[in-house]
UniProtKB/Swiss-Prot annotation:
It comes from Pseudomonas putida (strain GB-1). This is Glucose-6-phosphate isomerase. InterPro entries: G6P_Isomerase, G6P_Isomerase_C, Phosphoglucose_isomerase_CS, SIS_dom_sf, SIS_PGI_1, SIS_PGI_2. It comes from the Bacteria. Keywords: Cytoplasm, Gluconeogenesis, Glycolysis, Isomerase. The gene is pgi. It is found in: Cytoplasm. Its main location: cytoplasm. GO terms for biological process: gluconeogenesis; glucose 6-phosphate metabolic process; glycolytic process. It catalyses: alpha-D-glucose 6-phosphate = beta-D-fructose 6-phosphate. The keyword Isomerase applies. Belongs to the GPI family. GO terms for molecular function: carbohydrate derivative binding; glucose-6-phosphate isomerase activity; monosaccharide binding. It is an enzyme of class 5 (isomerase). The keyword Manganese does not apply.
């Protein structure tokens, strides 16, 4: 029987019990001492794959820890779960769907059946459609209503229709194609549209409306605003098709909006939004970096898919990262995880991983709807490089919470300035080192004596200078950011999230919590504009509605 049909109490498994006992035995474990005692620790706890290098030696683990965590993966049936996903079985139980974002990066010639139909020809048909459109725009053949070539593309979408594409197009900016600029419009805040449209010309702007249902509130409101702006700037209804295309499974709604059927790129219900950048949702990526580089992105993700399916768990990068997350979240009390990219172009990766992880594993019931017996997904947060060192790293070093971190850094910069990159790389390594080593009371006192302080002042100041250390982190190194390596990196985190969902017995591919806010939002809106006089369900919400209505102008 498939794993998703047999929800388990993971805390009752022998491997979980063994890990609990091991955690108790690890209470006094010191990474500083472990490195001093074992010159091979770095080699034992690091690996390379798909253009990525992972150092996970700065973790609160021994070889026994790793073995016990791998035992847990085996006991929950992880290998069967992986096979089920890649085979197209219905692992999204609450929605009755397979999960096949991995199909989008499989090569020509592969076969994969969904309900008895090989979906791969359709996948590659859409990829060819993307290639054709991108070629026409880059070659100046797609023209606006004034017959001028398109110079700006605006992707209108939110959530997975925005975060993944924005991450990739920004991360691969050094690969950007000249002549076409890509922009993103997500928030329903009118200020975002105002600031964006101020720098655009309607006659040379193409809008991509990305919404699977073509019914997403924020996306439709922004699409209507873009349409109104386009008409006010001199465009006509008759020429609308030159300036609006869609990525949607609702062709009828897109056609009713004014988009020609041949300019509607399909989506499939077996691709979730936060896993959709590999699909036609990635059209703005292809427009930004070209289809050759987009295909390299897909190829890099495919290499990670192969690694994930074939590597033994103790040498499997996504599996190891997932197991470490379980180790800290369920046995060490960690409630959050920091993502710290030391690269300007990767500055948006934290936002994408927030959605990927928190929307996937922010669940409190098992696949069968019964309550979980343990904590599930952590809060994902962080930010770019050295900026964080002068903001929130203080809490990582001396705060009371254990917060594991992933440092992500390239060896080579696209834009070397003097010795800046050497300093950037040095800062990345020194932060992970400082988290691990810390500073003892004796070291703090010796440092203060070296500065000439008297013993009374040393006694007062030393406690403030002590840094506990023993704080875990992973360091992910790439030689240089490229489409292929970025594809592997993003796919790695996708698989990490899936592995954790299997261990906890939850569904990583639905998001019912998001829907409640949408439903309630309709009633709040009606009360704000006066079309519904009935009071809100609670006094707080009604009070805030009254506050708005008493002061809003416009």
């Amino acid at each position: 029987m498939a794993y998703y049909r047999t929800p388990h109490d993971v805390t009752a498994l022998p491997a979980w019990q063994a890990l609990q006992q091991h955690r108790d035995a690890m209470q006094g474990f010191s990474m500083r001492e472990a490195f001093a005692a074992d010159a091979q620790r770095f080699d034992q706890f690091s690996l390379s794959c798909c253009g990525l290098f992972l150092d996970y030696s700065k973790n609160l683990i021994t070889e026994q820890s790793r073995d016990l965590l791998v035992n847990l993966a085996n006991e929950v049936g992880l290998q069967d779960a992986i096979k089920s996903m890649f085979a197209g079985e219905i692992i999204n139980a609450s929605e009755g769907r397979p999960v096949l974002h991995t199909a989008l990066r499989r090569p020509v010639g592969d076969k994969l059946s969904v309900n008895g139909v090989n979906v791969m020809p359709e996948v590659h048909k859409v990829l060819n459609q993307i290639t054709e459109l991108v070629g026409r725009i880059h070659d100046g053949l797609w023209r606006g209503y004034s017959e001028k070539p398109i110079t700006d593309v605006v992707n209108i979408g939110i959530g997975g229709s925005f975060l993944g594409p924005e991450l990739v197009s920004e991360a691969l900016l050094p690969y950007a194609q000249r002549g076409v600029r890509c922009h993103y419009l997500a928030n329903i805040d009118g200020s975002e549209f105002h600031e964006l449209s101020a720098n655009l010309r309607a006659e040379t702007t193409l809008f991509i409306v990305s919404s699977k249902s073509f019914n997403t509130l924020e996306t439709l409101k922004n699409a209507m605003a873009a349409r109104t702006w386009y008409l006010a700037q001199g465009g006509s209804e008759a020429e609308l098709y030159r300036h609006f295309i869609a990525v949607s499974s609702n062709k009828a709604a897109a056609v009713a909006f004014g988009i020609r059927e041949e300019n509607i790129f399909p989506m499939w219900d077996w691709v979730g939004g936060r896993y959709s950048l590999w699909s036609a949702i990635g059209l703005p990526i292809a427009l930004a970096i070209g289809t050759a580089n987009f295909k390299e992105l897909l190829s890099g993700a495919y290499t990670m898919d192969q690694h994930f399916q074939t590597a033994p768990f103790d040498k499997n990068m996504p599996v190891l990262l997932a197991l470490l997350g379980v180790w800290y979240g369920n046995f060490w009390g960690a409630n959050s995880h920091a993502i710290l990219p030391y690269d300007h172009y990767l500055r948006n990766i934290t936002k994408h991983l927030q959605q990927l992880d928190m929307e996937s594993n922010g669940k409190s019931v098992l696949q069968d709807g019964t309550p979980v017996k343990t904590d599930t997904g952590p809060v994902i947060w962080g930010g770019v490089g050295c900026n964080g060192q002068h903001a929130y790293h203080q809490l990582l070093h001396q705060g009371t919470q254990l917060i594991p971190a992933d440092f992500i850094v390239p060896v080579v910069s696209f834009n070397p300035v003097a010795d800046h990159h050497q300093w950037l790389y040095a800062n990345c390594l020194s932060q992970s080192q400082a988290l691990m080593l810390g500073k003892t009371r004796e070291e703090a006192e010796a440092e203060l004596r070296g500065k000439g302080l008297n013993e009374a002042d040393i006694e007062k100041l030393a406690p403030h200078k002590v840094i506990p250390g023993n704080r875990p982190s992973n360091t992910l190194v790439v030689e240089r950011i490229s489409p292929r390596r970025l594809g592997a990196l993003v796919a790695m985190y996708e698989h990490k999230v899936f592995v954790q969902s299997v261990i906890w017995g939850i569904n990583a591919f639905d998001q019912w919590g998001v829907e409640l806010g949408k439903e309630l939002g309709k009633g709040v809106y009606q009360r704000l504009v006066g079309s519904l006089e009935e009071s809100a369900e609670d006094g707080s919400t009604q009070g805030l509605i009254n506050y708005f209505r008493g002061r809003h102008r416009g």
